[in-house]
């Protein structure tokens, strides 16, 4: 398989919806039972529209875009910045592009820039994944 080129777009991938049940499952698995994630009344009391998804849950969903991009890719690192709360019920979509490709002796190192967008197209999270490709 040929190496990707900088600027190459990744196909958009659905990352949600992130409903209350998914948020509750994540809270149990992670041990993060902050009421802002689990109790709509608490979230509204601090000015949010509803309970919100955990940032790491959003990050995990966004990482699917990098992990599913090429079967031969090995993830070296993944960073994420959260730009807005993600209320329960949000339907996120991930998209991205190849930002950089470096040739190595045994393959290529690729940096992907990734975005998680809500149904209105607003960016909820921005990620950067570094992947290693063989050959």
Language-model features: locations:
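A generic structural signal for short beta-strands and their flanking turns/coil linkers
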Residues: 14, 22, 32-34, 74-78, ...
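HotDog/MaoC-like acyl-thioester-processing domains
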Residues: 1-12, 85-135
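Catalytic strand-loop segment that frames the active site of acyl-thioester-processing enzymes
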Residues: 1-51
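Hydrophobic beta-strand-centered segment that forms part of the acyl-chain substrate-binding groove
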Residues: 44-53, 57-98
